[in-house]
Design a protein with these regions (language model features):
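Short acidic capping loops at alpha-helix termini that bridge into adjacent secondary structure
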Residues: 14-17, 48-52, 85-86
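Beta/alpha (TIM)-barrel catalytic core signal, keyed to glycine-rich beta->alpha loops juxtaposed to Asp/Glu
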Residues: 58-235, 239-251, 266-275, 282, ...
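Glycine-rich anion/phosphate-binding loops
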Residues: 28-36
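Active-site groove signature of glycoside hydrolases
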Residues: 42-63
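N-terminal binding-site loop/beta-alpha segment at the start of enzyme catalytic domains
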Residues: 1-17, 74, 80
Length: 319
């Protein structure tokens, strides 16, 4: 924020751009904290208003907390004063909490949510996009390249499929054009670490190709192939839930399988330890066996949870 503020002021660019930043919801302890952080951000950005202000990374617990702190009153006041022009939120939560947040406030205008061709049914996925479309709320997409994992170290099985495409694209083009061809996606945010990546994204965005039916079939086949590389065959059906000990079995397996699939244990560990409450992680399993009897895939769920616990390991528990 300090860098952006200085750059925009020194170059007189403020009127040429829209500024978006986020409120650190997890840091809020009392109602006055919302305005405190907003005023600090306005100071850093050297502006008197923020165009798009997001309540950032809302989890179920964070949402319940900030509602009690009357965050919606804060948003109303900030909109009325002009400190904020448009409001939204970002979230990696499940669909039920996502819908609760959407329905709680009629002034949401945009939501930042995770989506890519692997994550159609992960977190809120396509169901979340359906809800945004229903409410006429703008959608901004994060993780279009899955943190770069969809374009780096491509498994041979996946590359072989891409090579069969009638219209040749790079892995970056496949991932971005998949999203840009969806009528429920308004804006795609992709992290960039170099000027070369900036130029590459500009070039792709300036020449978006249509995704044909055969292209869609190929993308689905690539997604299926990636998923054969997972650690177990959990389908996230939910028959094992709720666990009597409170273990979040589905999300424990989701993060484990994504880490195995993309060969990215560190990235999945960050998600695992930051998004799953401590009491709901794999090591809370007591091997009661209730879940095994209802699993359609006949997974030995306690044994699989033990694998999850060993996979992430104690060395990752600093996130």
């Amino acid at each position: 924020e300090v860098f952006i503020g200085n750059f925009l002021k020194e170059n007189s660019y403020r009127d040429d751009v829209l500024i978006s930043t986020k409120s650190p919801s997890w840091l809020m302890e009392e109602k006055g904290d919302f305005e405190y952080y907003l005023d600090k951000q306005l100071e850093k950005l050297k502006t008197d208003s923020i165009d798009i202000y997001l309540l950032h990374a809302l989890t179920k617990d964070d949402w319940n907390k900030v509602r009690k702190l009357r965050v919606l009153d804060f948003l109303d006041d900030s909109l009325s004063s002009g400190k904020i022009k448009h409001v939204g939120f970002s979230s990696h939560t499940e669909i039920d909490t996502f819908v609760d947040i959407l329905d709680a406030y009629p002034k949401w205008e945009v939501v930042l949510t995770q989506m890519n061709y692997l994550d159609e049914y992960y977190q809120t996925g396509v169901m979340g996009l359906d809800e945004l479309k229903r409410l006429n709320i703008g959608s901004m997409i994060m993780e279009p390249l899955r943190g770069g994992r969809l374009v780096q170290n491509i498994p041979p099985e996946v590359q072989k499929l891409w090579d069969c495409a009638e219209v040749k694209r790079t892995p970056v083009e496949w991932a971005l054009e998949y999203l840009w061809n969806r009528n429920d996606v308004d804006c795609v945010l992709s992290g960039m670490n170099s000027l070369e990546q900036v130029k590459q994204n500009i070039q792709i965005a300036s020449n978006v190709k249509e995704i044909s039916e055969s292209d869609q079939d190929l993308i689905r086949e690539v997604a299926r192939t990636y998923k054969t590389l997972t650690g177990n065959e959990c389908t996230s059906c939910g028959y094992c839930m709720p666990c009597p000990e409170g273990v979040d079995i589905i999300n424990c397996f989701n993060e484990y399988n994504i880490g195995k699939m993309l060969n990215n244990p560190k990235g999945s560990a960050m998600q695992y330890f930051s998004l799953i409450d401590e009491d709901c992680r794999a090591d809370s399993c007591i091997d009661c066996g209730d879940c095994e009897f209802v699993c359609p895939q006949m997974l030995d769920i306690p044994q699989e949870l033990e694998k999850v616990d060993k996979y992430f390991g104690r060395e990752f528990n600093h996130f």
